[in-house]
């Protein structure tokens, strides 16, 4: 098994890292911490609505959790938290290719992360906030643990890592970013996310990226990828699969 080692707030990839696990132990209540339930009856707790009701005293008011468009369900793992409208979890190389080609003229941000990467965990809430304040930008999340071969084919060797794509321009920039260098991400978002009219269809992945994914067997031809391959001179799947970098 390979491992992801943490250097500062970046995670350098040499393959897979096991998920970190925390030991859990039951805590004991001290006698002075106990409650006299006869004197202070407890009202029922509505965990479905995330509302905690304290003692049944008329002066006590329940605490209501704040709501937003960012998914923060109880028990949800940190990398599963996302906006409801413009953040999508990529499931395969074909899913990635199709999502980029179907984005039209929208700016698309590929967010490469790993559940075991501390830098990714620290940065993720900021990315969710930026996604919420930039609804016209599409954020595609790529889990390196589940799509390791694809990430290697896309030359992603450090996390967190981002690639920006825009319409007919294709890839416009790529870089590693941490919570300490979040301004780099914000500047790229402002620069490439401004309103513009792109002439031509969305380009998506470039030729080298497509070739790399095909060479490791990650990419299977469908109508969209076949159309993209024909634009660079490959008319059959056999020709595309044998494309040399």
Swiss-Prot record:
Thioredoxin domain boundaries: 93-194
Entry keyword set: Chloroplast, Disulfide bond, Electron transport, Plastid, Redox-active center, Transit peptide, Transport
Pfam family for this entry, one: Thioredoxin
A GO CC term attached to the entry: chloroplast
Superkingdom: Eukaryota
Transit peptide: 1-92
Active site: 117, 120
Annotated localization: Plastid, Chloroplast
Main location: plastid
Gene3D superfamilies: Glutaredoxin
Cysteine disulfide partners in this protein: 117-120
Keyword Metal-binding applies: no
PANTHER family: THIOREDOXIN, MITOCHONDRIAL, THIOREDOXIN-LIKE 1-2, CHLOROPLASTIC
Its job: Probable thiol-disulfide oxidoreductase that may participate in various redox reactions.
Protein family: Belongs to the thioredoxin family.
UniProt-recorded name of the protein: Thioredoxin-like 1-2, chloroplastic
Organism: Arabidopsis thaliana
């Amino acid at each position: 098994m390979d491992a992801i080692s943490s250097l500062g707030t970046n995670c350098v990839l040499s393959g897979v890292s096991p998920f970190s696990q925390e030991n859990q132990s039951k805590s004991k209540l001290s006698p002075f911490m106990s409650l006299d339930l006869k004197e202070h009856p407890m009202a029922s707790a509505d965990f479905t609505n995330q509302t905690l009701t304290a003692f049944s005293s008329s002066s006590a008011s329940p605490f209501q959790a704040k709501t937003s468009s960012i998914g923060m369900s109880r028990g949800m793992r940190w990398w599963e938290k996302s906006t409801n409208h413009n953040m999508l979890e990529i499931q395969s190389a074909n899913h990635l290719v199709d999502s980029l080609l179907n984005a039209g003229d929208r700016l698309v941000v590929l967010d490469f992360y790993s559940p075991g990467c501390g830098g990714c965990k620290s940065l993720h809430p900021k990315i969710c906030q930026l996604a919420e304040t930039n609804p016209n930008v599409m954020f595609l999340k790529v889990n390196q643990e589940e799509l390791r071969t694809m990430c290697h084919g896309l030359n992603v060797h450090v996390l967190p890592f981002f690639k920006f794509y825009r319409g007919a321009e294709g890839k416009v920039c790529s870089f590693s970013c941490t919570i300490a260098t979040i301004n780099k991400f914000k500047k790229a978002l402002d620069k490439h996310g401004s309103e513009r009219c792109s002439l031509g269809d969305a380009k998506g992945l470039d030729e080298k990226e497509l070739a790399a994914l095909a060479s490791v067997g990650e990419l299977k031809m469908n109508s969209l990828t076949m159309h993209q391959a024909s634009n660079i001179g490959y008319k059959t799947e056999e020709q595309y699969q044998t494309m040399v970098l």
